[in-house]
Amino acid sequence: MKLSKNFSLKELTASHTAERKGINNNPNDDQITALQKLCENILQPVRDHYASPVTVSSGFRSEELCVAIGSSVNSQHAKGQAADFEIFGVPNAELAKWIIENLDYDQLILEFHKTDEPNSGWIHCSYKSPSDNRKSTLRAFRNDQGKTQYEEYKPE
């Protein structure tokens, strides 16, 4: 099933962990609708702008999959509203900046990016609806104790 011109349901539900553990990672109709909105408003515009494939490392996650990987069952991934992705050859800070400046999103997190390693980390981006999007923009990093921390992110 196509969610947009270049994105399929199979691509947004793919999970090695789900396959390995025999977990059903099939979304319901509401979650599929949310995935379509995510593709139409975030992933497809990114793909069109850069004219390069977008590699989705994590899209939809069923509740059972969330539990298996230690994620919250209330995460936006479980609602079909979020994806983690990157474009090989495009620095993730550049990709984040373009999204921030050009798209309406709910939350964008530049995850585990290191300024001295332009291709490090990835983008987490979610989409709800024009009236519900918060435009929350964060950076995730590991503190000195190895725990994940978040702080407001403003691109340079």
Where are these regions (language model features)?
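Catalytic cores and adjacent binding grooves of peptidoglycan-active enzymes
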Residues: I87-E156
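Structural recognition of the beta-strand scaffold that forms the well-ordered cores
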Residues: T55-S57, A82-E86, H124
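Extended, low-complexity, intrinsically disordered C-terminal regulatory tails
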Residues: L43-G70
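Extracytoplasmic cell-surface/polysaccharide-interacting catalytic and binding patches
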Residues: M1-H49, R142-E156
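Acidic, His- and aromatic-enriched active-site or binding-groove loops in soluble protein domains
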Residues: N74-A93
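A generic structural signal for short, non-catalytic loop/turn and secondary-structure boundary residues
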Residues: K2, H49, A78, E117-P118
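Short, flexible, solvent-exposed loop/turn segments with mixed acidic/basic and small polar residues
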Residues: A68-A78, H113-D116
